[in-house]
C-alpha cells in the first residue's frame, strides 16, 4: 500500500494542503504529555511552595495560548479559529509525574490534532521551565494524540 505525504507536492516540495473544497465538519482532538520528576519537586508544586507561583495555572494558560498560535510555529499548519481549548493537569504522585491532557475543537475544514499536541507539549515545557531551577533532569514523555474526530479520515483512537 502506498502512503502519500499530504504536505509534499508532486515535485517533492513542501506545501500547505489546499482545504478549499473540503466540507466543514465538527472536529476535535485530544492529546497528552507527561512530565516525570522527583517526588520532592512534585510536592513543591502540589503544596503551593514553588517560588515562581502556581505552576499548574501557568502551564494551563501556556498550553491554551500555544494551541492558538500553532500555525505560527508549525510551518504548514493552517491558521484556525478554535472554538474550544482545554488543558487539564493531573498530578500522579504514585508515578512521580504530571499528566497533561489537552482538547481542541472547531467547526472547520481541517483537523485540530497539531493544536492539541502543541497545547500538551507547551504545557509540559512550561512545567519544565518553571521547575528547572529545582530539578534539571525532569523528563517530558509520551506526547501523543489520544483521539480525533471529524473530517474525511473519521474517528481515530490511540491504542
From Swiss-Prot:
GO terms for biological process: Mo-molybdopterin cofactor biosynthetic process. It comes from the Bacteria. Keywords: Lyase, Molybdenum cofactor biosynthesis. The active site is at residue 129. SUPFAM superfamilies: Molybdenum cofactor biosynthesis protein C, MoaC. Substrate binds at residues 76-78, 114-115. HAMAP family: MoaC_B. Homohexamer; trimer of dimers. NCBIfam families: moaC (TIGR00581), PRK09364.1 (NF006870). Belongs to the MoaC family. This is Cyclic pyranopterin monophosphate synthase. It comes from Psychromonas ingrahamii (strain DSM 17664 / CCUG 51855 / 37).
Amino acid at each position: 500500500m502506498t502512503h502519500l505525504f499530504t504536505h509534499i507536492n508532486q515535485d517533492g516540495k513542501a506545501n500547505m494542503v489546499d482545504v478549499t473544497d473540503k466540507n466543514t465538519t465538527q472536529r476535535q482532538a485530544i492529546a497528552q504529555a507527561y512530565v516525570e520528576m522527583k517526588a520532592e519537586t512534585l510536592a513543591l508544586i502540589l503544596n503551593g511552595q514553588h517560588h515562581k507561583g502556581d505552576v499548574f495555572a501557568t502551564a494551563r494558560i501556556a498550553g491554551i495560548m500555544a494551541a492558538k498560535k500553532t500555525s505560527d510555529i508549525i510551518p504548514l499548519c493552517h491558521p484556525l479559529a478554535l472554538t474550544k481549548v482545554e488543558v487539564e493537569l493531573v498530578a500522579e504522585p504514585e508515578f512521580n509525574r504530571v499528566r497533561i491532557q489537552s482538547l481542541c475543537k472547531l467547526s472547520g475544514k481541517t483537523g485540530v490534532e497539531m493544536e492539541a499536541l502543541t497545547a500538551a507539549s507547551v504545557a509540559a515545557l512550561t512545567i519544565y521551565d518553571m521547575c528547572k531551577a529545582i530539578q534539571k533532569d525532569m523528563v517530558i514523555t509520551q506526547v501523543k494524540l489520544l483521539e480525533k474526530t471529524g473530517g474525511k479520515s473519521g474517528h481515530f483512537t490511540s491504542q
